[in-house]
């Protein structure tokens, strides 16, 4: 382990040393560019564009372009990037992750690679976690880019397609990760190319890259349509589930958060719903509703996993503590929670398009990111995104004091100690930021502080709209701020007058998160830019992490110490080591899950790419689509004829071929059964294709205007493809949910999913061919065709 860490640090040092030489070149232009007039400095932008057009590369012009962006920032923003920020900028340009501590100026660091890459004219996306940060950075940094002659676009959810198109056509586009993903999906659902908004995905710099590419990696972006209602079944399942007893009727496995009925529970369900066998095929809808109701009632916790506001169930992001507006749990879990909470049950939805962030961001030609905390996930970034994590040195040495964890026997004794600590700091005027893992604990702590007359601000999923304002004041003398994990990422906590003398900002963690990275983010709020600061984590044996993964060694250690007093406090390196070992175990599990998600999602990615590519060819076509439609008809004819001409001619089923032809291709007068008799299979295929060719020619005559024929073909293909594709997405979802339950003995579920998924995809393509054949051959021509 020690050798691994040593090589890790040395490889970073080597990389930083290499980039330091490039930074020297950037800094060598400092005096020359500071003497240029504004006009001369601004004239560098068209000069660089010309040089790129004449064959120079972005790497060739990097030192000069970075130096121009740096001098421009000094003149326009009053900020001059430090040497370490230049190194961070080079890291981003090279498609890697710059790990920069809080307060080291990530936003300013990004201006140099953004400017350089925007010169190529293919678009640069700056990606943030929320619209507040997108708007702020587009406005503030936009001044610099505009001054240097580049256009800046802001892509917000509320914008019209025209406004979005303008934003994407700008040299630099600011957007949230979710809006980028949804725009990509919507672009692949349009029926007219003019409705598309995005350009090809070129270069993205992702701010808070760990939050987007790790924490949200498994979150699928889903565009849904309404499906059929089954409200009554959710209510019945909920009423039944509420009568069950833990252990007797159902069992919960907390480490995996899975729940299942016992034999007794199954018996009760069969009696309650009047069934012989709960797991019969015809009862799958009911078992699905029961599974979701069990999860909703006994695993999903109010004010931790979700909150209820104004009669609506809203998801709480477990990593940021924010309410995820507009997001709903899939597979009926959201409806089951609505039944549990007695609020209106909203209609279930059908997925029409979906993609995960992992697969969306891997489509960029070049991807980079910045964050204060990424080293703990370095392997994942390298394996999944092919990005290295480079730790950028701080501009000034870190002066923060990170104290060892303290452990209490109970939640009550822990919170008692936390309140005592906060109160003493408040009384001497030292600002304190208190991090909690859940909304529930932030509200409990708030009540305890009220009882102790300590004024404070609370920042959690219920009032995140005040986030920037609360965080801005968190460094003032005597300020006490309670925040869930998000702790205002993206907004710096600046120290007020006199606070440095009091020891700077104190950060108190009320429990360890299951991810070390989230703990490090909280620590990083203190001691920015060389300021003093202090951090302390409080834990109890009743904390979630300790309950789920607290080792036997900790329990044995406490027994040996004979600790029974509620206020007893333990501070031991062994405890800290055990906690970190538990965190590493959880991180390993989470990484394996994300990796598995990606392997499953790659099956859908390949299929999605095939469908989207073919769909795009149809939308972009400017000539007739005969080259697309005739092969579809030919494949359908071949399949039907081959199916019914197996073995001896006496066994052939010519009636079935005739039925297909008259229902899907021609009228009964055109083709009698006698015309098929006495012919070989190849001759039958040729005869049917002759009808297809004649039909095509007739339609072309009827639609003498070339555009009308093309429009008719596009209508037919797009309608069929879209309907079959959305059904296929749904079927693949169901396959994925059921594949683990199948009794395949020693078979690998992923291999089964890949093989079955491929078979279903082939089947869907056949269905598309068949439906297109029938619709094209049988459709009556109407004027004013619209897609």
UniProtKB/Swiss-Prot annotation:
Pfam families assigned to the protein according to its UniProt record, in alphabetical order: P-loop_SecA, SecA_DEAD, SecA_PP_bind, SecA_SW
Keyword Cell membrane: yes
GO biological process terms, semicolon-separated: intracellular protein transmembrane transport; protein import; protein targeting; protein transport by the Sec complex
Membrane topology: Peripheral membrane protein
Reactions accelerated catalytically: ATP + H2O + cellular proteinSide 1 = ADP + phosphate + cellular proteinSide 2
Lineage: superkingdom: Bacteria
Positions of transmembrane segments: none
Subcellular localization: Cell membrane; Cytoplasm
Binding positions (ATP): 85, 103-107, 492
Coiled coil spans: none
GO terms under cellular component: cell envelope Sec protein transport complex; cytosol; plasma membrane
Entry's EC annotation: 7.4.2.8
Keyword Membrane found: yes
GO MF: ATP binding; protein-exporting ATPase activity
Keywords recorded for this protein, A-Z: ATP-binding, Cell membrane, Cytoplasm, Membrane, Nucleotide-binding, Protein transport, Translocase, Translocation, Transport
Function text: Part of the Sec protein translocase complex. Interacts with the SecYEG preprotein conducting channel. Has a central role in coupling the hydrolysis of ATP to the transfer of proteins into and across the cell membrane, serving as an ATP-driven molecular motor driving the stepwise translocation of polypeptide chains across the membrane.
Family assignment from sequence similarity: Belongs to the SecA family.
Quaternary state and interactors: Monomer and homodimer. Part of the essential Sec protein translocation apparatus which comprises SecA, SecYEG and auxiliary proteins SecDF. Other proteins may also be involved.
Name of this chain's protein: Protein translocase subunit SecA
Gene expressing this chain: secA
